[in-house]
Amino acid sequence: MRYALLILCLMMVGPVTYAAKIKTTEELVHAMQKKYGKSWYKTATFVQKTTEHEKDGTLKVSTWYEALAVPGSLRIDFTPVKDGNGILFTDNKIYVFKNGKVDSNRPFVHPLMILGFDIYRLSQGDALEKLKGLKFDLSMLREDKWQGRSVYVVGAKQGDLRSLQFWIDKKNLYFVRMIRPTGKDGAQTQETQFNKYQRLGGGWMAPEVIFTVDGKTVTTEEYSDMRADVALDSKLFDPQYFGTVHWKE
């Protein structure tokens, strides 16, 4: 009798487990935050080799030093650092620096920061609002395959590789791909890939980032010397100190 009851209970578990599968973007964000919300690093630094693919076929290679404060801030110092040139993303703005001084700034929410990093350190409500503000259609979620792995796709139907959308690895719940229209009247398609993920602190980081337009690679980024939960001066992310405070000389 007990054995029969046990079998019956196990049979009942099947439908419950199936019902618990992720079926909405809200559930996906919740799962991502539940998995990493307490462990994901709050700061990180890395050295980036940036390769720009010029139209004439030549390659322009440069080194950037980058520092993250999650959520919300990313600092990029172009080499040589002493020249004071770079970019700062903070407080939903982008600042461009030349010779240590602000050359321009404007409102900007960085989609790759939100999807790749900030989503784990924002509240669920704030994360969803950011994604809505970026114009992703959160009502659309499906499953697909990418590079041999199962993924969730938010924002586009099966076979649509034009509309604004982002892809999340199903097992590890990290961001792997974004597609969006670009160029005049959205006639071109831009794709961003986060590849070759490695464990970093209590989270992950993709040491290879590829940007393409209409299937042609335009920029690649290769990260090295990746470090998590680094002690960083808050002034690193304050525009008024960009020219005087650095994490890497």
What are these regions (language model features)?
Residues 61-64, 86-91, 103-113, 168, ...:
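Short amphipathic beta-strand/extended segments with alternating polar/hydrophobic composition
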Residues 4-12:
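Sec-dependent N-terminal signal peptides
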Residues 15-19:
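Sec/Tat signal peptide C-region and signal peptidase I cleavage site
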Residues 20-101, 139:
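N-terminal mature ectodomain segment of secretory-pathway/periplasmic proteins
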Residues 83, 147-239:
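Gly/Pro-enriched, hydrophobic low-complexity segments
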Residues 31-33, 61-62, 123, 137-140, ...:
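Short structured motifs
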Residues 20-30, 40, 95-162, 182-188, ...:
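Flexible, processing/modification-adjacent segments and terminal tails
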